[in-house]
Amino acid sequence: MHGILSPGAWAFIAYVLGAVALCLVMLGLGRVLGGRSHGRAKNLPFESGVDSTGSARLRFPVKYALVAMLFVIFGIEMPFLYLWAVSVRENGWAGFVEVALFVSLLLAGLFYLHRVGALDWSPERRRRKPRD
């Protein structure tokens, strides 16, 4: 007669408990054996012996955030295209039409971003105004 849990479940529970116990032991040893220093220099950043000057908070233009978002959006297309490429024979013409539609939507988005100036890094005075 088997108990409520199978032997595999007991092994999994033992594994999780062991991992948690190992983490707690390592955290506890670090707390007990770690040195403590209190003072004004404790909260200063370490700069290889050089005294830091100025603020560490730099302001980045919004363009960097825009480029990061565009990279994420257009970078997501690669796994989809790869999955289509490895299964092109199984998908047939229906898969080809779907991928063609997907790529055309991405290209339309890219042309739109170019038209509104999201990809233009030139200074404001040299920018070309979009035609309406």
UniProtKB/Swiss-Prot annotation:
Membrane topology: Multi-pass membrane protein
Membrane-traversing stretches: 9-29, 66-86, 93-113
Enzyme Commission identifier(s): 7.1.1.-
EC top class named in words: translocase
GO cellular component: NADH dehydrogenase complex; plasma membrane
InterPro entries, per the entry: NAD(P)H_OxRDtase_bac/plastid, NADH_UbQ/plastoQ_OxRdtase_su3, NDAH_ubi_oxred_su3_sf
Principal subcellular localization: membrane
Record key words, sorted: Cell inner membrane, Cell membrane, Membrane, NAD, Quinone, Translocase, Transmembrane, Transmembrane helix, Transport, Ubiquinone
GO MF term (any one): quinone binding
Family of this protein: Belongs to the complex I subunit 3 family.
Described function: NDH-1 shuttles electrons from NADH, via FMN and iron-sulfur (Fe-S) centers, to quinones in the respiratory chain. The immediate electron acceptor for the enzyme in this species is believed to be ubiquinone. Couples the redox reaction to proton translocation (for every two electrons transferred, four hydrogen ions are translocated across the cytoplasmic membrane), and thus conserves the redox energy in a proton gradient.
HAMAP family the record matches: NDH1_NuoA (MF_01394)
PANTHER family, alphabetized: NADH-QUINONE OXIDOREDUCTASE SUBUNIT A (PTHR11058:SF21), NADH-UBIQUINONE OXIDOREDUCTASE CHAIN 3 (PTHR11058)
Protein known as: NADH-quinone oxidoreductase subunit A 2
Encoding gene (name): nuoA2
